[in-house]
Amino acid sequence: MASKGIDKTIYFVRHGQVSHDVDENGVHREHDPLLNDEGRKQALQLQHDLDAEKLPIELILVSPMRRALETMKIGFQHYIEDKHIPVKVIPLLQDCGDWACNVGSYTKDLEKQFPGYDYTACHEDPVFPKKEKIYKADYKTSIQRSRVLAEFFAKVPEKVFAVVTHGVDIRLFQKIQKPEDSLDAVPKEHSFSPCQHEEFRMHYEDDKNWNFEPVK
C-alpha cells in the first residue's frame, strides 16, 4: 500500500497514429503494429515540442505496445540520449482491448527491437502479454487496473515523470471512460489525439481515492 497524501506531476502522452488492417467487421487484425508514416511525423513533432518545453521529468514510463515504444523513442530521444532520463517499460500501461492490435509482443522480441530500456517489470509479470486476469479486456477489469496503476504511480520515488500510453488508459485515469465505450477503439469525444501530451497533477489518498487534474 502506498503512503497517503501523495502528489505527483505526470505528463501523459498518447502514442502516434498507426495503420490498422481492418477486416469486414471493422476489427483490427494486425498484431501490435508500429507507427505509420503519419505517426512518425507526429512523433517528430512531439520531439520538437518536448525539446522546446524542457520538461523537468526524472523518469519515463512506457506501455510495452510497439506503437508506444516507438513514439517514446522518437519523442523523448534527446531526454534519453542527452539527459540520460531512465525508461521503464510497464506492462500495466498496455492498451485495454483484446483485438490483435492491442495484444502485446513477447518481451524478448521487444528487447531486440527496442534495446536499452528497463524491461524488469515485463520479465516479472506472469501474465503479459496474454489478455488474462488483470489484463482481461472488460470495463470492470480495466477500472481495477487503473487503480493498480494509480497506486504504482504513487509508489514511484520520482515526483515528476512522463507516461507514454494509450487513449483509453488516459480516459480511465481521468475517470471519463464509460462501460458502454469501446476498449479497442478510443472514443473521439474527450480523448487525446495521437501524440497529444498534457501535464496533470495526481493526488493519491488510497486505491479508491485518487484523481488526475489537468494543468491548464
From Swiss-Prot:
<keyword id="KW-0378">Hydrolase</keyword>
<feature type="active site" description="Tele-phosphohistidine intermediate">
    <location>
        <position position="15"/>
    </location>
</feature>
<dbReference type="GO" id="GO:0005737">
    <property type="term" value="C:cytoplasm"/>
</dbReference>
<comment type="similarity">
    <text>Belongs to the phosphoglycerate mutase family. BPG-dependent PGAM subfamily.</text>
</comment>
<dbReference type="GO" id="GO:0016791">
    <property type="term" value="F:phosphatase activity"/>
</dbReference>
<feature type="site" description="Transition state stabilizer">
    <location>
        <position position="166"/>
    </location>
</feature>
<keyword id="KW-0539">Nucleus</keyword>
<keyword id="KW-0963">Cytoplasm</keyword>
<dbReference type="GO" id="GO:0005829">
    <property type="term" value="C:cytosol"/>
</dbReference>
<dbReference type="InterPro" id="IPR050275">
    <property type="entry name" value="PGM_Phosphatase"/>
</dbReference>
<dbReference type="InterPro" id="IPR013078">
    <property type="entry name" value="His_Pase_superF_clade-1"/>
</dbReference>
<dbReference type="Pfam" id="PF00300">
    <property type="entry name" value="His_Phos_1"/>
</dbReference>
<dbReference type="GO" id="GO:0005634">
    <property type="term" value="C:nucleus"/>
</dbReference>
<protein>
    <recommendedName>
        <fullName>Probable phosphatase SPAC513.02</fullName>
        <ecNumber>3.1.3.-</ecNumber>
    </recommendedName>
</protein>
<dbReference type="InterPro" id="IPR029033">
    <property type="entry name" value="His_PPase_superfam"/>
</dbReference>
